[in-house]
């Protein structure tokens, strides 16, 4: 339901619904005492069919924590949100949800879907107020880099249960590669905005972590907040 200009895993026409069942079986087989990431596409497009997936993990791999990447729009459905909230009390689960602007037109432009901002904001409010753990993600681009601090300020004032704000550097993969010239902004061009965003997060009492940036591209103040990303090609 989103077509982000920088989607790292562009949608395919093939039906891969079977992967949800296979993923549940694989997670249960591993029995991992750690975190497993769930992404897509958009995993919450399964709607209520996603709930049995969570139930299966709770029953068969209770020590496994889940981190689910989603655009958050499904949480605008309060009935779905309440069902997920019940399950979130039985398993360690966090939802990584992006908000790319405090302005509807900018967010909708970047995700390629009119009305996405309003639905995502409603979803974030519903999820947070229901006690669901949220990691709020922001990717700076040409369209939004000037408002990084405003986005963080907006998040701190409007939403609840935000466990972390993640500032993530744009990756040249998927649709970002073909749209690179119209969305990428040199990191050095918005160093002051990164610093201001850090200040805004501090005022809000929300931890901020930075991903996908070489330290030499960040203001020194941000170094202690930079995480070492998992892929070797990001560490240059």
Language-model features: where?
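Conserved alpha-helical substructure of the radical SAM core
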Residues: 2-68, 75-78, 90-91
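Short glycine-enriched, charge-decorated loop/helix-capping segments at active-site entrances
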Residues: 9-14, 109-115, 180-185
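Amphipathic, non-transmembrane alpha-helical secondary structure
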Residues: 20-28, 47-55, 78-85, 121, ...
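Conserved C-terminal portion of the radical SAM core fold
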Residues: 31-38, 65-67, 93-94, 118-183, ...
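Conserved radical SAM core fold
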Residues: 43-45, 72-76, 95-113, 141-143, ...
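Short aromatic-enriched loop/helix-cap "lid" or pocket-rim segments at secondary-structure transitions
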Residues: 50, 80-81, 148, 177-180, ...
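Short, electropositive alpha-helical surface patch
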Residues: 54-57, 145-163, 218-236
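Short, hinge-like loop/turn segments at secondary-structure boundaries
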Residues: 84-87, 113-115, 153-155, 182-185, ...
């Amino acid at each position: 339901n989103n077509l982000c200009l920088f989607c790292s895993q562009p949608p395919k026409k093939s039906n891969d619904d079977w992967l949800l069942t296979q993923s549940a079986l694989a997670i249960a087989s591993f029995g991992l005492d750690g975190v497993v990431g769930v992404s897509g596409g958009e995993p919450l497009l399964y709607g209520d069919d996603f709930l049995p997936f969570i139930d299966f993990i709770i029953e068969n791999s209770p020590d496994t924590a889940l981190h689910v990447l989603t655009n958050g729009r499904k949480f605008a459905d309060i009935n779905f949100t309440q069902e997920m909230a019940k399950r979130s009390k039985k398993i360690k689960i966090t939802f990584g949800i992006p908000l790319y602007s405090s302005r509807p037109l900018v967010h909708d432009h970047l995700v390629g879907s009119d009305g996405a901002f309003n639905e995502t904001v409603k979803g974030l409010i519903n999820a947070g107020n229901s006690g669901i753990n949220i990691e709020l993600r922001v990717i700076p681009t040409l369209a939004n880099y000037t408002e990084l601090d405003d986005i963080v300020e907006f998040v701190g004032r409007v939403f609840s249960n935000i466990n972390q704000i993640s500032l993530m550097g744009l990756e040249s993969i998927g649709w970002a590669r073909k749209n690179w010239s119209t969305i990428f902004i040199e990191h050095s061009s918005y160093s002051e905005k990164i610093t201001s965003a850090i200040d805004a997060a501090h005022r809000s009492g929300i931890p901020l972590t930075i991903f996908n940036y070489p330290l030499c591209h960040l203001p020194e103040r941000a170094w202690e907040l930079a995480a070492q990303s998992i892929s070797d090609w990001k560490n240059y």
